[in-house]
Amino acid sequence: MTKTEGKTASAAVKDILLSNPDGLREVIRTVMQEVLEAEMDEALGAAKGERTPERLGYRSGHYGRTLITRVGKLELRVPQDRSGHFSTELFERYQRSERALVATLAEMYVQGVSTRKVKAITEELCGHAFSASSISAINKRLDESLKAFAERSLEEPFAYLILDARYEKVREAGVVMSQAVLIAVGIDWDGRRQILSVEMAGRESRSAWKDFLVRLKGRGLKGVELVVSDDHAGLVAAIGEVIPEAAWQRCYVHFLRNALDHLPRKHGDDCLQELRWLYDRRDLDEAKADLAAWLGKWSVRYPRLTSWVEETIEQTLTFFRLPRQHHKHLKSTNMLERLNEEIRRRTYVVRIFPNTESCLRLVRALAVETHENWMEANRYINMDDLREHKKLALRQAA
């Protein structure tokens, strides 16, 4: 038993960070060891040494396993059970995106576009320098699993569709360009979020978004009642062309950011904060009453802003058609912020991708991990609320 294994994870982590110069690596190792032991406890229905009639089996020691991460090699002790049935998904799930990141860094080095830092990182991670053939082998294994995810059939309907894009720097033919990463998330009738697609595009054009949505429909996307996105003209046009039956909700967070363009640089008052409050109202009538009061208060001081708001704000109020319990989840694209933060954290290490394929590989690997976590988590929203909401609307219309 190592020095830290007899302690709780929190106590061990504190000791490590205070005394060990390689503290971060040991913190990650300690946490992952705890995960492995907890997985075994769950599989056996009992903790180590616990006597209970619910026990499903017994432990049978450990075997060593090395996990490659960006903080170095982690030596872990994987628990075994007597029947030999226990298995963990920790390594495959964790290393998918790590392998994608390592392969990207290595590819940069082999192509001669990296720095001494990149060479040091890749050699520290894997213990050796990379050849073109070893990178190709890594990429082939990754691409096979990611392709299956990207091309899977969408058998079930998705009531809500959230679309967003972010930009990454990619080197193509010796020129560094910003390329769009298009992302689609759906919410199914079980109330779970699913990442439906992640693709690269040269830019966020109408044709790029149209092709993206057409491919989604070709894989079986159906039943979309509401699409949430920003107001990019090409995206909005593509939604209207490919999914005309769906209502559109303009992300109110993007809307409020856009409002800054219509204000003096130093306005220094609560104008936009008061506008933001109307999105917390119970229903559309309350929101419109607040809007009328807001326009009356600020129209003299900021006529350019209030005129723009009056013309465009209706696009941000579509979510009031939904059950109140769904408002906070569907009035913006904020649900994608955590995924985007994780992508940003990983891609920051690379800065400039050596090609489009390496960028897509890493972002998709991260998307698969997020998708798996979402599918195992509790449902995101209760879709019974929407079912009851629709029934009530039908009764009122009769």
From Swiss-Prot:
<comment type="function">
    <text>Required for the transposition of the insertion element.</text>
</comment>
<comment type="similarity">
    <text>Belongs to the transposase mutator family.</text>
</comment>
<protein>
    <recommendedName>
        <fullName>Transposase for insertion sequence element ISRM5</fullName>
    </recommendedName>
</protein>
<dbReference type="GO" id="GO:0003677">
    <property type="term" value="F:DNA binding"/>
</dbReference>
<keyword id="KW-0233">DNA recombination</keyword>
<keyword id="KW-0238">DNA-binding</keyword>
<keyword id="KW-0815">Transposition</keyword>
<dbReference type="GO" id="GO:0004803">
    <property type="term" value="F:transposase activity"/>
</dbReference>
<dbReference type="InterPro" id="IPR001207">
    <property type="entry name" value="Transposase_mutator"/>
</dbReference>
<dbReference type="GO" id="GO:0006313">
    <property type="term" value="P:DNA transposition"/>
</dbReference>
<keyword id="KW-0814">Transposable element</keyword>
<dbReference type="Pfam" id="PF00872">
    <property type="entry name" value="Transposase_mut"/>
</dbReference>
